Swiss-Prot record:
Subcellular localization: Secreted
Full protein name: Vomeronasal secretory protein 2
Summary of the tissues where the protein is detected: Specifically expressed in vomeronasal and posterior glands of the nasal septum, the ducts of which open into the lumen of the vomeronasal organ.
Gene, per the UniProt record: Lcn4
Keywords tagged on the record: Disulfide bond, Pheromone-binding, Secreted, Signal, Transport
Native source organism of the sequence: Mus musculus (Mouse)
Function: Transport of lipophilic molecules, possible pheromone-carrier.
């Protein structure tokens, strides 16, 4: 019975999103205010084989209409890097720009409550880099939204092998921290 329900739910989600150009953009920035969890990522870069993909919560704030601020921690080579990005809404629906217009963010509202896709195109130095995130309000996996994300990124030209489902962690602890030598970021 559960598999039948899952199949029906998934089929309706996929049918709803048949044309991904019609996937609705977020309508109100304040819907994103709060803490979010990265459920899946995709990027053109090849990730290091055998290395665990780790994600930390993202915090969005909406200081004024048309502006989103994103605070996030990244782990790189055992170091914790705190990142703050200010996104400014453009004239295009669902589009936000950052880094002097070199990076465009598109925020898609999914039919599953409290889930969004953030798709980014970065154009620094005439190179184009694309990446995407499936985010949710809660850290637990949601198979339905993951399937929608897979279909979405395939439509954008990514290979499914590039999808990463990260291990959720509350906070980043640098590996050089002697109290936590066994804990890698």
């Amino acid at each position: 019975m559960k598999s039948l329900l899952l199949t029906v739910t998934l089929s309706s989600l996929v049918a709803t999103l048949q044309t991904y150009d019609d996937l609705p953009f977020i309508s109100e920035e304040d819907k994103l205010s709060g803490v979010w969890f990265i459920k899946a990522t995709v990027s053109q870069r090849r990730e290091v084989e055998g290395e665990t993909l780790v994600a930390f919560p993202i915090k969005f704030t909406c200081p004024e209409e048309g502006t989103l601020e994103l605070r996030h921690t990244l782990a790189s080579k055992g170091e914790c890097i705190n990142v703050g990005i200010r996104l400014q809404r453009t004239e295009e629906p669902g589009q936000y720009s950052a880094f002097w217009g070199h990076t465009l963010f598109y925020i898609y509202d999914l039919p599953v409550k409290d889930h969004y896709i953030i798709y980014c195109e970065s154009h620094p130095f005439q190179k184009i880099s694309q990446f995407g995130y499936l985010i949710g309000k809660y850290p637990e996996e949601n198979q339905d939204t993951l399937e929608v994300f897979k279909e979405f990124i395939q439509h954008k030209g990514f290979l499914q092998e590039k999808i990463g489902v990260p291990e959720q962690r509350d906070r980043c602890i640098p590996i050089h921290d002697s109290a936590h030598q066994d804990h890698k970021c």
